[in-house]
Amino acid sequence: MASSMLSSAAVVTSQLQATMVAPFTGLKSSAAFPVTRKTNTDITSIASNGGRVSCMKVWPPIGKKKFETLSYLPDLSDVELAKEVDYLLRNKWIPCVEFELEHGFVYREHGSTPGYYDGRYWTMWKLPLFGCTDSAQVLKEVQECKKEYPNALIRIIGFDNNRQVQCISFIAYKPPSFTDA
């Protein structure tokens, strides 16, 4: 008796659900959307490297250890570092200075699978610079870290506290004793 009641209730529910779904009416007309077209003067869509396009040559990756963003480029000057820090401040990211004394790159000492102790996590220099608005403050912290640990690799990261992610990371200082190979 109980099984017959359940089956009849299930039939009634499925009929009710079938009538509640609206039929598919198709896609909306594209006339309501604005149309954007490239002008003929845009040479970025040309497949060849002709014209006035100037490409920057990067450092060869062969025999070089890969670090972070911009790692294949030559070392950044203080002016270039300030521009990078200004970029992360403009994006409302929180700058943080980190350093590493032994390895500045990903390495696997105790196995082939990635883990916590494979060089991804560096030591934080002080606390993140919450409320920082000037790149000179960040570069001052880099100089203090360099003075305290002259043989350490130093990097600057930009942390987005809304999305809870690290958005940018680049090497700010390599010690003279460090070799890329």
From Swiss-Prot:
Subcellular location, record wording: Plastid, Chloroplast
A GO cellular component annotation in the UniProt record: chloroplast
A biological-process GO annotation: reductive pentose-phosphate cycle
Alphabetical list of SUPFAM superfamilies matching this protein: RuBisCO, small subunit (SSF55239)
InterPro entries linked to this entry: RuBisCO_ssu (IPR024681), RuBisCO_ssu_dom (IPR000894), RuBisCO_ssu_N (IPR024680), RuBisCO_ssu_sf (IPR036385)
CDD domains (UniProt xref): RuBisCO_small
SMART domains: RuBisCO_small
Keywords for this protein: Calvin cycle, Carbon dioxide fixation, Chloroplast, Photorespiration, Photosynthesis, Plastid, Transit peptide
Residues of the transit peptide: 1-54
Molecular function terms from GO: ribulose-bisphosphate carboxylase activity
Pfam families, per database record: RbcS, RuBisCO_small
Described purpose of this protein according to its UniProt entry: RuBisCO catalyzes two reactions: the carboxylation of D-ribulose 1,5-bisphosphate, the primary event in carbon dioxide fixation, as well as the oxidative fragmentation of the pentose substrate. Both reactions occur simultaneously and in competition at the same active site. Although the small subunit is not catalytic it is essential for maximal activity.
Subunit structure, as described in the record: Heterohexadecamer of 8 large and 8 small subunits.
Miscellaneous section: The basic functional RuBisCO is composed of a large chain homodimer in a 'head-to-tail' conformation. In form I RuBisCO this homodimer is arranged in a barrel-like tetramer with the small subunits forming a tetrameric 'cap' on each end of the 'barrel'.
Family of this protein: Belongs to the RuBisCO small chain family.
Protein name, per record: Ribulose bisphosphate carboxylase small subunit, chloroplastic
Name of encoding gene: RBCS
